[in-house]
Amino acid sequence: MEKDKAYILDDRGYIFIEGKDSEEFLQNILTNDVNKIKTNNLIFSSILSPQGKYLYEFFVIKYLNKYLIECEKDTAKEVSDFLNFYKLRSKVTIAESKEKYVSFAISSEKFNEIKSENKNQKNFFILDENCYFEDPRLKKLGGRIIAKKADLDLILKKMNLISDDKSKFFSYCFKEGVPSINLSKLKNNLFGVECNLETLNGLDLKKGCFIGQENTSRIMLRNKLRKRLLPIQKISGEILENDIIKYENHEVGKVMIDKPYSFALIKIVDPELHKFVNVELTCGKSKIKILKPEWIT
């Protein structure tokens, strides 16, 4: 990412959770440990189905004495409805934000510069009621700012940032192996651990029970993780959703997200991933190759 560019993410939704049972309520649902927010002020987390299938992912932030969930705008209502369904007798209030917010991504270099200028030691801080934080998934994904929409132009000017096309950020995330848009195509189609939650700091098996915990623990603790969500790059033809990927006579994957940044659920054993990761593969009627991120061992 370019140092002085801000990638405006106008496709994000915001949900506030407040009430005396908020912490316990979220702890019983989310894949990550909500207690970490006391130290770090934020976490990356997910919600799974009772079977351990992927449903949603988001950042959770302690903001203005409430919990703020920042997620894809298209799924914000679904996430809010899901949480309200599980609320039962918990003393919590869950609602999409009525105030207008906007998120934007910035480079790690710029984030560290802002942090230093404001004499902050932590990777999360608030300036003028706007949130600044380092992406907890991967340091290479830089920093993020969640601001009141009315403050956007002022922040850009004050921080010497120039607004740029969000597609450049999505492309950067793709190259780092992290899907950023069209995540709804993953819903109920693969296990949460197959989405690399443990590697991207979105899963804590030591926290205790959460929705989908039983199957998730079984897969991880018994070393039964056999597939991972990985980026794929077109060589020729057109990649289509649900296309089967083949290596020699073996089915080694299936396309989950086709456009604009393609991701597939890929076998990592039987055959071993290293045998075909840099090989031209058949994908439906197209040819592709798998892009293995550095953080995948």
Report residues per predicted region.
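Acidic, low-complexity central loop/insert segments
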Residues: 5-9, 14-16, 59-176, 247, ...
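Short beta-strand-initiation
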Residues: 10-12, 42, 53-55, 140, ...
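Short, surface-exposed ligand-recognition loops at beta-strand->loop->(often short) alpha-helix junctions
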Residues: 16-22, 35-36, 106-112, 233-240
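Solvent-exposed residues in well-ordered beta-strands and their adjoining turns
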Residues: 18, 72, 107, 148, ...
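Glycine-centered loop/turn motifs
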Residues: 40-41, 118-125, 238-243, 276-278
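Glycine-rich, small/acidic residue-mixed loop/short-helix segments
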Residues: 54, 195-203, 213, 217-297
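Anionic-ligand-binding alpha/beta catalytic cores of soluble enzymes and soluble regulatory domains
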Residues: 143-231
